[in-house]
């Protein structure tokens, strides 16, 4: 997970992510964002869930989260990430997490009930 360095969610822990650039597929954006924010190379897996959240200035953000397998690199914060680290599900209760993330991951079956 990463600790967001900028708004929205500055200072909160979340899953790495970001905007899809013009012409990019979801998979291409995921690979790019993971490397930019964590230094990790990944292979994209299946979609695990999607959600809509309010953004800045009344915008709506469509979030699509995918499973991914790390294939290389060294974990380090970069780009929008102020920090990056591996976490166990039990660690999440002790961190300030972006709104709705725990609920979404639980609903999608990523975290236990």
Which positions does each model-derived feature cover?
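Generic beta-structure capping elements
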Residues: 2-5, 18, 69, 80, ...
